[in-house]
Amino acid sequence: MNHFAKRIIPCLDVKDGRVVKGVNFVGLVDAGDPVEIAKRYNDEGADELCFLDITASHLGRDTIVDVVKKVASKLFIPLTVGGGIRTIDDISRLLNAGCDKVSLNSSAIKDPNLIDEAAKKFGSQCVVVAIDAKKIENGYSVFINGGRIDTKKDAFSWAKEVESRGAGEILLTSMDNDGVKQGFSLELTKIFSALSIPTIASGGAGKMEHFKDAFEVGADACLAASIFHFGEIEIKKLKEYLKANGVEVRL
């Protein structure tokens, strides 16, 4: 699907209220402070921000709500939070704390009705479903639990089901490309561009050209982590490059 301006979304891993795999910006007082980092991305021209809560314990659920409250008060761009969201109550607490969207992953596979319920109660615009796809012999399969469990579901069929249940957006990660910095999976992104809801491409960004390539095959947004966090690519420069190459972005 092709919508309006293309979006650039940095993603931060948060554990026990701290950003892990620290962010290496010049002049950060505290490389683990989600509020400081969020504010920096806001100022750098990110279109949205994504937090992945990797806190394992249930106690940690309260921590992410506190983080969201603090960050949302300083942030002027949409914030999505994913990781460990299992119930309507979890979603409600995060949205009330000030996040704009929630990202469902394993929980959507285990209980697909959660998508319908969340979309009905909060609106499709709040519901993102994350799909981690890995190439298999004859297509792509959906994996959960950090890529450890093969659900044996076809990724595109699942995406169509998710769309029909009311999800407003799909966060598509190519497990084969993730962390390799050789580019997003263009084949996978192109397949998903046939959906009528937006697709965020994730996994594999290494240089500016990779973003351009993903947008050209139909991604609506691109998400990346380390290349932004370690200053390998500055968002402002990336957007200028994209604009110069005919990709519509908000400068």
From Swiss-Prot:
Pathway(s): Amino-acid biosynthesis; L-histidine biosynthesis; L-histidine from 5-phospho-alpha-D-ribose 1-diphosphate: step 5/9
One GO term describing the cellular component: cytoplasm
Catalytic residues of the enzyme: D13, D132
Subcellular location: Cytoplasm
GO biological process, one term: L-histidine biosynthetic process
E.C. number(s) listed in UniProt: 4.3.2.10
Enzyme class: lyase
Keywords, ordered alphabetically: Amino-acid biosynthesis, Cytoplasm, Histidine biosynthesis, Lyase
Reactions catalysed: 5-[(5-phospho-1-deoxy-D-ribulos-1-ylimino)methylamino]-1-(5-phospho-beta-D-ribosyl)imidazole-4-carboxamide + L-glutamine = D-erythro-1-(imidazol-4-yl)glycerol 3-phosphate + 5-amino-1-(5-phospho-beta-D-ribosyl)imidazole-4-carboxamide + L-glutamate + H(+)
GO molecular function, one term: lyase activity
Subunit: Heterodimer of HisH and HisF.
The family this protein is said to belong to: Belongs to the HisA/HisF family.
Function: IGPS catalyzes the conversion of PRFAR and glutamine to IGP, AICAR and glutamate. The HisF subunit catalyzes the cyclization activity that produces IGP and AICAR from PRFAR using the ammonia provided by the HisH subunit.
Name recorded for this polypeptide: Imidazole glycerol phosphate synthase subunit HisF
Organism: Campylobacter concisus (strain 13826)
Taxonomic path: Bacteria, Pseudomonadati, Campylobacterota, Epsilonproteobacteria, Campylobacterales
